[in-house]
């Protein structure tokens, strides 16, 4: 009787155990996931979103009624979207209710916008009217527009407008030659020189070491009495071109024409490539692995010519046999063996629809195949584990949107920053307000091109050799460097053509200024000098200046600043080409790019998207990185469009560059590098280029004016410190070259002050762990970095401070040469005064000596006492038997009066055993 009952009980226990184990083996989802009844895991945010993501609808069961916020629009299916997405021309509601006629009643456009017509609910900025770009679907914004050219302009046959001064000047400024048609024979004025080809140039340009006539007659030896090329002296590591240019010596006979006259590739021996290399059609050598890799590495694209594409069984209409063959998909399960191993005719799989059972385990779409099945996902989703679909975060692609990318389930949304609006046709963000225009150098003049109307005019004429420029939009000023005069100038743009309005800012200690940048927030100007191998800074009026860097620079060229984050960036095309970054006060210098870079010329900053762009004249490329040097990308690699790029600028979704070899200005999409177009041709050594628009220079607080004291309390220069963290210092004080900051870190002295600063001893101090302060010594020969201890207490000296987070900068003249000494302190740290240091040492040393003497006396006494102590152990068997679980007791009898004093079981006479040194 008991055995059957026991058996049934045992069987019941086994069943319960099986159920328990089955339950325990149930798949567990992560904390940020929702577990469906069918054990599927989905993101927790997908629950109760009106979508059946579990496929059993368990994620939509027992959901509370959803109420959209006041700033949201409620879709008819219950979804909530931002109200600004309603009636924007794109359906964000899955049911399209946000773009329905009921929701989109006729909009009333505000005063600063115009309507796209009765059949459209779209409003566009008034500045987009008659800008040459169709922004309304109907094109009504470009209808009935008057001719674009003003009375002082000439309209070319291609409808572009140029300054009337460019007509019949011997140059094809229109691009189609219409400005040089029907021109009477040129007659040069008394202040002009006539070239042998009858072209007139200013007399000022004759014998200036730069050929302006196509036949070089203005620089001939007969006229000038000397060979202009003899005046250019190249360094030992450089090669002098036939026209006097200097290039790196290792660029000679490398297969790439770097000299403008191509003399670096003349009389070169026949190039022989190594066995592991491929020789291009032009003779250059590339690594053999780069041949037929679907990337054009040779300048003539010969590395990709004649390549045989490997056959792959990747087409949906193909089937890959397990034995390796690739057969037509229609031959699968047709009762005929087409694969050697019969893998196209599996008996147990042909004719079976796996999707009929639980949707094949697919979370969304199950596609039955002749053999097996596969899971698919709707648009905006991707397979996570071959069965489960997950949302695609399109915003992970930095090129997904022009500016702002917002990812949501199954799709994404692009938006624009303040000051920009989305063009619904191109999906690009366009600037609102005045038309942007390009300003660029053209050797003897500065010109501008309106990017909307394509107006083309001259700003500054009659210059010698302008190579660098920048603008300050708020004040409408332009700054430029003239390489011939070795000076930096400034003027108001609308008055710059008048030489009387041109102000000389810097006219001394300049050798070869090739880059200039304006800090429009803190009103400073920065420039590079490849001759002096320095980077310098001055106030915008040029009254106060100093050298920021004078070491580890070879050929510094372009420079750009970011006053909002308080950093500067520059390119150096010397022996070790690189792009560097540092704070506007010279702190935190670091290399961003040092590999795969040869001849970096122009650089430019996209402040909105935090990207740095640069062109490489040796690699014929246009590349970009983020502000930390990461996410590097080559946008364009073309020897035709980037023959010798120099200047660079970026705005909206376009990047612009000048090219010395093509003598033109190009433009391309800054995200993809596609849509390359020519904006201006037939130029004369175009170098630098900038975009003039108010959105290019956003407003930001002046760090030096946040202090209660003017100029941050600095006697000379107040330089903004880089913004690294919320606790970063705001600025540092700086002195002119060969002068020192005083103890107060604000005043400047010709010699290091010897009079100590007043010291206030605080009544109480708060102890902190010792810190360190870095001292960087930058000299003409080398760079030394030392570490000095920082004050231990929080307050030791009374040094006036203009701001609680102000970093202090000490500049000094080293006795060994013109070197700069800069000591940077933390936010709340104070500098050591020499008197305070001496006082601290005078107190600490005696205390340490007395402490050591006391410790030595104590150790001698303890050692003597232990030597005069004897131990005896008594073993009582009876006592031990009754206390066998207790530890063994020891009784110590000493010669001293301290009878019965208990010592540790182990008596050590060695000082090392006591843990003492």
From Swiss-Prot:
A Gene Ontology molecular function term for this protein is: calcium ion binding
Q: Which GO terms describe its cellular component?
A: caveola; plasma membrane
* Keyword Metal-binding included in the entry's annotation: yes
Its name, as the record gives it, is Low-density lipoprotein receptor-related protein 8
Q: Annotated region Clustered O-linked oligosaccharides: where?
A: 754-813
Protein purpose:
Cell surface receptor for Reelin (RELN) and apolipoprotein E (apoE)-containing ligands. Also binds alpha2-macroglobulin. LRP8 participates in transmitting the extracellular Reelin signal to intracellular signaling processes, by binding to DAB1 on its cytoplasmic tail. Reelin acts via both the VLDL receptor (VLDLR) and LRP8 to regulate DAB1 tyrosine phosphorylation and microtubule function in neurons. LRP8 has higher affinity for Reelin than VLDLR. LRP8 is thus a key component of the Reelin pathway which governs neuronal layering of the forebrain during embryonic brain development.
Q: Which PANTHER family match?
A: LOW-DENSITY LIPOPROTEIN RECEPTOR-RELATED PROTEIN 2-RELATED
All copies of the EGF-like domain together span 346-390, 391-430
Q: Tell me how this protein assembles.
A: Homooligomer.
Q: Which Pfam families match?
A: EGF_CA, FXa_inhibition, Ldl_recept_a, Ldl_recept_b
Recorded family membership? Belongs to the LDLR family.
Highest taxon of the source?
Answer: Eukaryota
Kindly list every residue the record annotates as glycosylated: 158, 196, 532, 628, 782, 820
How does the entry describe its membrane topology?
A: Single-pass type I membrane protein
Keywords for the protein's UniProt record, in alphabetical order: Calcium, Cell membrane, Disulfide bond, EGF-like domain, Endocytosis, Glycoprotein, Membrane, Metal-binding, Receptor, Repeat, Signal, Transmembrane, Transmembrane helix
Cite the record's tissue specificity text.
Mainly in brain.
Outline the LDL-receptor class B repeats, range by range: 476-522, 523-565, 566-609, 610-652, 653-695
InterPro entries found in the cross-reference section: 6-blade_b-propeller_TolB-like, EGF-like_Ca-bd_dom, EGF-like_dom, EGF-type_Asp/Asn_hydroxyl_site, EGF_Ca-bd_CS, Growth_fac_rcpt_cys_sf, LDL_receptor-like_sf, LDLR-related
Under the heading SUPFAM superfamilies, the entry gives: Growth factor receptor domain (SSF57184), LDL receptor-like module (SSF57424), YWTD domain (SSF63825)
According to its UniProt entry, the protein's GO biological process terms are: endocytosis; ventral spinal cord development
Q: Which residues bind Ca(2+)?
A: 46, 49, 51, 53, 59-60
- First-listed, main subcellular location of the protein, grouped into a coarse class: membrane
């Amino acid at each position: 009787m008991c055995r059957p009952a026991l058996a049934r009980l045992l069987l019941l226990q086994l069943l319960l155990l099986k159920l328990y184990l089955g339950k325990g083996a149930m798949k567990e989802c992560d904390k940020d996931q929702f577990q469906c009844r069918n054990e599927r895991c989905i993101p927790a945010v997908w629950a109760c979103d009106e979508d059946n993501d579990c496929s059993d609808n368990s994620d939509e069961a027992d959901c509370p009624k959803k109420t959209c916020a006041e700033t949201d629009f409620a879709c008819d299916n219950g979804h909530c979207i931002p109200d600004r997405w309603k009636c924007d021309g794109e359906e964000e509601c899955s049911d399209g209710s946000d773009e329905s006629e009921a929701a989109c009643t006729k909009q009333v456009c505000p005063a600063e916008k115009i309507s796209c017509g009765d059949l459209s609910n779209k409003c566009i900025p008034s500045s987009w009217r008659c800008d040459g770009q169709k922004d309304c679907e109907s094109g009504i914004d470009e209808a009935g527009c008057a001719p674009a050219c003003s009375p002082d302009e000439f309209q070319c046959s291609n409808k572009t407008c140029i300054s009337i001064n460019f007509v019949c000047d011997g140059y094809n400024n229109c691009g189609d030659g219409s400005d040089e048609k029907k021109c009477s024979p040129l007659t040069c004025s008394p202040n002009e020189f006539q070239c042998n080809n009858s072209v007139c140039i200013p007399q000022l340009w004759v014998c200036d070491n730069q050929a302006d006539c196509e036949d070089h007659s203005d620089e001939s030896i007969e006229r000038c009495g000397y060979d202009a090329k003899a005046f250019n002296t190249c360094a030992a590591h450089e090669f002098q071109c036939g026209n006097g240019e200097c290039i790196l010596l290792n660029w000679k006979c490398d297969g790439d024409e770097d000299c403008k006259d191509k003399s670096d590739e003349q009389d070169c021996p026949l190039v022989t490539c190594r066995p592991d290399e491929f020789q291009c059609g032009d003779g250059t050598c590339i690594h053999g692995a780069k041949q037929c890799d679907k990337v054009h590495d040779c300048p003539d694209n010969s590395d990709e010519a004649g390549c045989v594409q490997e056959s792959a069984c990747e087409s949906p209409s193909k089937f890959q046999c397990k034995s390796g063959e690739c057969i037509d998909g229609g031959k699968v399960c047709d009762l005929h063996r087409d694969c050697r191993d019969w893998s196209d005719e599996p008996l147990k799989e042909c004719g079976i629809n796996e999707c009929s059972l639980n949707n094949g385990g697919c979370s969304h779409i199950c596609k039955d195949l002749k053999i097996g099945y596969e899971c698919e996902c709707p648009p905006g989703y991707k397979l996570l584990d071959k069965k489960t679909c997950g949302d695609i975060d399109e915003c992970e692609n930095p090129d997904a949107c022009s500016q702002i990318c917002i990812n949501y389930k199954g799709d994404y949304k692009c938006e624009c920053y303040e000051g920009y609006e989305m063009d619904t046709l191109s999906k690009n963000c366009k600037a609102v307000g005045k038309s942007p225009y390009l300003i660029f150098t053209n050797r003897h003049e500065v010109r501008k091109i309106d990017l909307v109307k394509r107006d083309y005019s001259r700003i500054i004429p009659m210059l010698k050799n302008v190579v660098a420029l920048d603008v300050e939009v708020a004040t409408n000023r332009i700054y430029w460097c003239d390489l011939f005069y070795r000076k930096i100038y400034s003027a108001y743009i609308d008055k710059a053509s008048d030489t009387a309005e041109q102000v000389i800012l810097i006219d001394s200690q300049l050798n070869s200024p090739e880059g200039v940048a304006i800090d429009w927030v803190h009103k400073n100007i920065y420039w590079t000098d490849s001759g002096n191998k320095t980077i310098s800074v001055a106030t915008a009026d040029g009254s106060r200046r100093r050298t920021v860097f004078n070491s580890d620079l070879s050929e510094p060229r372009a420079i750009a600043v970011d006053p909002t984050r308080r950093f500067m960036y520059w390119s150096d095309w010397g022996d070790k080409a690189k792009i560097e970054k540092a704070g506007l006060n010279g702190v935190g210098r670091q290399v961003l790019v040092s590999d795969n870079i040869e001849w970096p010329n122009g650089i430019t900053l996209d402040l909105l998207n935090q990207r740095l762009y640069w062109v490489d004249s040796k690699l014929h490329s246009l590349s970009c990185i983020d502000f930390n040097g990461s996410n590097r990308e080559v946008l364009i690699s073309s020897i035709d469009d980037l023959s010798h790029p120099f200047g660079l600028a970026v705005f909206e979704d376009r990047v612009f560059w000048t090219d010395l070899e093509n003598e033109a200005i190009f433009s391309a999409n800054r995200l993809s590098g596609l849509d390359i177009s020519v904006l201006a041709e037939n130029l004369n050594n175009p170098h630098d280029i900038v975009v003039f628009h108010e959105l290019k220079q956003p407003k930001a607080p002046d760090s030096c004016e946040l202090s209660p004291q003017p100029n941050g309390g600095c006697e000379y220069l107040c330089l903004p410190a880089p913004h690294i963290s919320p606790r970063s210092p705001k600025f540092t004080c700086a002195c002119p070259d060969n002068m020192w900051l005083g103890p107060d870190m604000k005043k400047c002295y010709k010699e290091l002050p010897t009079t100590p600063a007043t010291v206030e001893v605080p009544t109480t101090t708060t102890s902190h762990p010792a810190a360190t302060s870095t001292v960087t010594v930058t000299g003409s020969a080398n760079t030394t970095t030392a570490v000095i201890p920082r004050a231990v207490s929080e307050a030791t000296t009374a040094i006036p401070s203009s701001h609680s987070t102000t970093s202090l900068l000490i500049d000094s003249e080293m006795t060994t040469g013109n070197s700069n000494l800069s000591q940077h302190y933390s936010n709340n740290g104070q500098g050591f005064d020499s008197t305070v240091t001496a006082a601290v040492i005078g107190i600490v040393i005696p205390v340490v000596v007395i402490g050591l003497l006391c410790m030595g006396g104590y150790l001698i006494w303890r050692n003597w006492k232990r030597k005069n102590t004897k131990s005896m152990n008594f073993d009582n068997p009876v006592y031990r038997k009754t206390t066998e679980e207790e530890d063994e007791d020891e009784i110590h009898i000493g010669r001293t009066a301290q009878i019965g004093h208990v010592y540790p079981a182990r008596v050590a006479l060695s000082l090392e055993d006591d843990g003492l040194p």
